[in-house]
Design a protein with these regions (language model features):
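Subunit-assembly interface segments of extracellular/virion macromolecular structures
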Residues: 1-234
Length: 234
């Protein structure tokens, strides 16, 4: 099988990120961090602006730091030389931020929502992305949703096999009531319909020597940061 509707993939060896102090003004930044995805943030000292692509929560970070992965948009408005956020710099967002932990208040546009680490806050990781598409897998047309997988959180020399984990499950009328007969205008629990096969995928990484591929469709391989192969078939 192969791609039917791409589904294109891309490898980013420098997935820029900035690490934040986990709490700001007594509130865990994780309480509202997900709201930052898709917004623009600005360093209030550096003037650097970036688009937020994804968030890594402290419990998922190998360093224990809340980390924001970004695409830098603008450099400093003063000398156009700064390309990354400063250490110990407050960041602001171009949208209002709310959270139950903020009580009845919110963080207004342009007001600081977080503080970068005091040392080496700006880092680079690596990532692999797949776009929305349809793949022909195991005799079926399978929808694949856009997903970005972080390869190394704070490193730019990853070595992995990258691909889709294929999950198959049988959906019965007990799990999905819409499978019951509805010819009378309602779901008839006394007349369950046939079971359905559901195939879903998720983007995963494997070590280079892991060839247990029973539920794995390889899309590409990176070795010491270099993209070696991009599979065209699944």
């Amino acid at each position: 099988g192969e791609k039917v509707i791409p589904g294109n993939t891309s490898y980013n060896r420098r997935y820029y990120c900035v690490q934040l102090v986990n709490t700001f003004q007594g509130v865990p930044v994780a309480a509202y961090a997900e709201q930052l995805v898709g917004t623009k943030i600005t360093g209030l000292t550096s003037g650097v602006t970036a688009y937020v692509d994804s968030i890594l929560l402290p419990e998922d970070s190998e360093r224990g730091n809340l980390t924001i992965y970004v695409n830098y948009l603008d450099s400093s408005t003063t000398n156009n030389s700064t390309q990354t956020f400063f250490d110990a710099e407050e960041l602001a967002c171009n949208e209002i931020i709310t959270s139950g932990l903020l009580g009845n208040s919110s963080i207004s546009v342009g007001a600081p929502f977080g503080l970068t680490l005091s040392n080496e806050a700006a880092q680079s990781g690596s990532s692999f992305t797949i776009q929305n598409g349809i793949y022909f897998i195991r005799g079926n047309f399978v929808n694949v949703e856009k997903e970005t997988l972080i390869l190394d959180q704070y490193g730019t020399d990853p070595s992995y096999r990258i691909g889709l984990f294929v999950n198959e499950e049988i959906i019965t009328a007990d799990l999905d009531e819409t499978l019951n007969d509805n010819s009378q205008g309602f779901n008839n629990y006394a007349a369950p319909g046939a079971d359905r096969l559901k195939i879903s995928t998720s983007l995963i990484k494997k070590s280079l020597d892991d060839f247990d591929d029973g539920s794995f469709v390889e899309l590409g391989t990176v070795v010491n940061g270099g993209l070696r192969t991009v599979s065209k078939k699944t």
